[in-house]
């Protein structure tokens, strides 16, 4: 079987916010693969550069001048070699010439092309025999950089633990609906809206949101006799001014923010706590994990940015017991797989995640299964979110 790359095409498409995204098609002799990259609103300082000078056209121009010809004839089954070549052609340590989003689209499209050529699903090609089904965790109340006039905390999340992925998705949707009913009752003469990730957003406090999500989860849990895990993504770096954590109605010192994050676990029983501190405070994360890591999953996103070296630092300091995984934070499938391998070898749980500006590409569903991640973070409703969730349903059907 011939795995040489015959051609590679790139085009501009639109993401869920109406912004441009890069989509790439890798063409082999008897198969092809197409992938597109999402975009984040709350981005970590150590992520690779999405597009050079924040301009997708500059990245596309670099692709045509330097990458397209180099890919032709390359053995596509050598994923690590292809990803290494992308780094070499770019010539920087953060993809500032090609753009990490374009590198991501090329890397994933290549893996899809090989999977299609072999006649196997992508999760099996990437994960081999080591795969398992994750449970979805989705945003139901949103704030921060995902909405205007919402909560300071960026995401309030639920993960219903149904017998199947289908059940879990359905129960998450029911909780989302229940929260909409609660908010409609609270704001009878005001409209409520949906944020970037289709979570409810309105002018409420973080404390109100905590109580609403607890009540909605309890309602669905009691009615359907299921367990529901609640969570938050603080995205704390986005409201940290260098000295204080600035909420709508107060500002907290570092120690007060640590205590608040701990109370989310101890006092409210939340299982999932992401980015409770700024993205340089490895020691502060360690303090939170040492106090409540036995009952809650403390997850680093901006702290790690899917970067193997930062994950190693977190392991050394025992900063978290969970790592968020986003391919376009690091730029290639091989780099992502390395980060996952380092994390899992040291007992950290991985959570494969979408971005707020998503496309309908479903590749993260396959990666979550391939990496054996216990959770996949990809919303509850919205076409670009359900594209991933529906693909999980199809994958589970294959595996049952």
Swiss-Prot record:
Pathway assigned in UniProt: Carbohydrate degradation; glycolysis; pyruvate from D-glyceraldehyde 3-phosphate: step 4/5
Catalytic activity: (2R)-2-phosphoglycerate = phosphoenolpyruvate + H2O
Catalytic residues, chain numbering: 197, 326
Primary enzyme class: lyase
Gene Ontology molecular-function annotations: magnesium ion binding; phosphopyruvate hydratase activity
Binding site for Mg(2+): 233, 274, 301
Family (UniProt): Belongs to the enolase family.
Name of the protein: Enolase
Gene field: eno
